[in-house]
A protein has these predicted regions:
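Conserved nucleotide-state-sensing and coupling region of NTP-binding domains
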Residues: 2-65
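A structural signal for short, well-ordered beta-strand segments and their strand-loop junctions
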Residues: 2-4, 57-58, 74, 113-116, ...
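An acidic- and aromatic-residue-enriched active-site/binding cleft used to recognize and process polar
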Residues: 3-8, 61, 78, 117-120, ...
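Acidic-enriched, low-complexity/disordered segments with a strong bias for Aspartate over Glutamate
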Residues: 8-11, 36, 45, 71, ...
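Alpha-helical scaffold elements adjacent to nucleotide-binding pockets in ATP/GTP-utilizing enzyme cores
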Residues: 12-20, 69, 73, 92, ...
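Conserved RecA-like ASCE ATPase "motif II neighborhood" in helicase/translocase motors
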Residues: 41-99
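Non-catalytic, compositionally simple segments
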Residues: 83-180
Length: 180
C-alpha cells in the first residue's frame, strides 16, 4: 500500500511501480499471468496467489483505510506544508499515520516505511521514534559532523564514512552530483 499526502502523489508512485514491473527485465515475472488480475493505475495485482486485496493500492493520507489490509505500507511524503503548519495539524497527521498500524497484517515480514522531508523543526518525522519506529536521515551529502544528526544518520552512511567516504561527497552519486 502506498499512502501520500495527496491521492495524486500516491497514484503517481503506483504508476511508477507498475512501469518498473513492465519495463525492468528482472521484475517482469511480477506481471500477473491471470486475465482476472487487477491491473489499473491505482490498484493492481502482481503474480501471486489470489487475494481479496490488491497487491498494490494507492491512497491519500485522509482516505478511508478501514477495510484495507497490507503487508507493506509505504508512507511517502505524507507531511507537506499544507497539513503540518500548526501543532494541531501535525497531531492530526500523526494520528492518521499511526492508524495504518491497524491495517498492517500480523506477520513477521509486515512493515511500515516512512519516506519524507522535514517541513519544519516540529516535523512528525522527529516523533516517530517515540512510537517505536526506527527513523534515520539520509542527506544528499556526507556530513562533516555526524553527531549533529543525533544518532539518526542512516547506518549505511556511518559504514561508508568508516570506509573512507569524505565529508561533502554525494551519498548517492547516481541521483545527485555537484550540480545538485
Amino acid at each position: 500500500m502506498i499512502i501520500s499526502a495527496s491521492k495524486d502523489r500516491a497514484d503517481n508512485m503506483s504508476i511508477f511501480l507498475q512501469k518498473l514491473i513492465v519495463e525492468t527485465k528482472w521484475l517482469n515475472h511480477l506481471q500477473p499471468t491471470n486475465e482476472d488480475a487487477r491491473w489499473s493505475r491505482i490498484s493492481f495485482d502482481v503474480a501471486c496467489p489470489p487475494h481479496q486485496a490488491p497487491s498494490v493500492k494507492s491512497l491519500g493520507i485522509t482516505s478511508q483505510l478501514t477495510g484495507s489490509r497490507a503487508d507493506f505500507i509505504l508512507l511517502d511524503d505524507v507531511e507537506v506544508p499544507g497539513n503540518s503548519m500548526t501543532e494541531l495539524m501535525r497531531e492530526k497527521l500523526l494520528q492518521l499515520c499511526t492508524e495504518t498500524e491497524s491495517i498492517l497484517t500480523p506477520s513477521d515480514d509486515s512493515r511500515i516505511c516512512f519516506l519524507g522531508t522535514y517541513q519544519n523543526s516540529f516535523s512528525i518525522y522527529t516523533r516517530l521514534a517515540e512510537r517505536n519506529y526506527k527513523p534515520f536521515v539520509w542527506p544528499a551529502r556526507y556530513p562533516r559532523k555526524t553527531e549533529s544528526y543525533g544518532g539518526l544518520l542512516a547506518p549505511q552512511l556511518y559504514e561508508d564514512i568508516e570506509q573512507g567516504a569524505n565529508p561533502g561527497e554525494c551519498t548517492d552519486p547516481d541521483r545527485f552530483d555537484d550540480e545538485d
